[in-house]
Every structure is written in C-alpha cells, then in structure tokens.
C-alpha cells in the first residue's frame, strides 16, 4: 500500500520547515512526504507565500492548495487528483517524530484497519479530568490528534472531504472534525501507547 506522510505549515514556521521535512524523510519509511502549502492563507491575507527550498529531499511533494486551516494536512491530498496514496500519516510541522513511527503505524493498520494514533482522548474523561487523560493502549478514543501521528485510509478522507468543508465553517479544530466524521462512517479510532510500539514519544520543538 502506497503510504505518504502529510503535513502543512504557516509562513512564520517556513524557516524551520525544511529541517523538519528532511528529518521525516531520513527516519520514516514512506513513499512520499506531502507538504501542503496554500496559495493564500486566511490568517495571513497580506503575506506573499514563498515556498521553502526542499531540494535536499527526494520524496517531497509540494502540494499547492486551498487553505483549510490546520486541516490542510488532511484535505490537501484528499482534494488532489495527483494523490494516489492508499494510506496517510498526518503529522505536525513543529514536532520531531521518533524513527520507525510510520512503519509501526502501518503494521497496526494492516492488522486492524482503524485510525490508529499515538495521541488522542475520550471526551468525557477529558472534561472530567480538566484536560488530563490517561494513556491507553489498543483502546478506542473519541478524538485522534495529529500531534502524535495518526494513520488514515485515503479513501476515508476522500469520502469526507465535502462534509469537512461544512464543519470547517464552524471550527478550525481539525482533530475534532476528522474524528467526528470518522465516527459517522463507523470507522474505529484507536490509541496505541508508544511503549507498545517501541518508539519514543514525539518531541515538540
């Protein structure tokens, strides 16, 4: 199955973005790394978008697209006719991910096709514990978070792309939108503790 990593960014972070992408290419076993950069940013309407130089990276696909806020990492490839991937691993642009994260997530997906994540929570527990959540393993969650990395079937994203736009008008919280639409499609969302996939915790930089 063709697997891509997908992320997006904003102009203030472009200076560090090439190093993040290079680190992903060096340590993650995927076919392509999609860097989704909007033509224009809703948050930065007067900023001229100058795409960073990714020439040292052989797997990078720079996808110029519409701005869907943080959800651009999901919707950029979903709306692109050039994207022929089977699986996507969504990650953040300000996080250093542990080696082998992608291969571990693919293994989990092959064993059980679900939206597997290394960061997520159950809404009731999150509310009752004032944002504190316990670390699950191989258990369901209500919300997957791209911070820790989440693997999704591209067909799921293609099916939800029109509905995503309706929700996007109400909130920029891409994790909530994606998780809600996965639930509507009866797709399981499962959390795996990083200790059980033998990878280190993602490190925000």
Place the predicted regions along the sequence by residue:
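Conserved catalytic core of nucleotide-sugar-dependent glycosyltransferases
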Residues: 77, 96-166
């Amino acid at each position: 199955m063709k697997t891509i990593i997908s992320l997006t960014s904003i102009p203030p972070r472009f200076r560090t973005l090439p190093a993040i992408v290079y680190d992903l290419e060096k340590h993650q076993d995927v076919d392509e790394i999609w860097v989704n950069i909007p033509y224009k940013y809703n948050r930065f309407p007067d900023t001229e978008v100058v795409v960073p130089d990714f020439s040292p990276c052989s797997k990078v696909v720079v996808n110029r697209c519409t701005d869907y806020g943080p959800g651009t990492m999901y919707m950029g490839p979903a709306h692109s006719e050039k994207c022929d991937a089977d699986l996507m691993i969504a990650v953040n642009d300000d996080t250093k991910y542990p080696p082998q994260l992608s291969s571990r997530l693919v293994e989990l997906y092959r064993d059980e096709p679900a939206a597997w994540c290394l960061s997520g929570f159950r809404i009731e527990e999150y509310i009752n514990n004032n944002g504190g959540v316990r670390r699950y393993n191989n258990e369901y969650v209500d919300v997957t978070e791209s911070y820790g990395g989440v693997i999704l079937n591209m067909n799921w994203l293609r099916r939800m792309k029109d509905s995503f736009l309706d929700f996007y008008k109400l909130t920029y919280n891409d994790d909530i939108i994606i998780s809600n639409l996965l639930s509507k499609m009866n797709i399981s969302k499962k959390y795996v503790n990083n200790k059980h996939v033998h990878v280190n915790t993602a490190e925000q930089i």
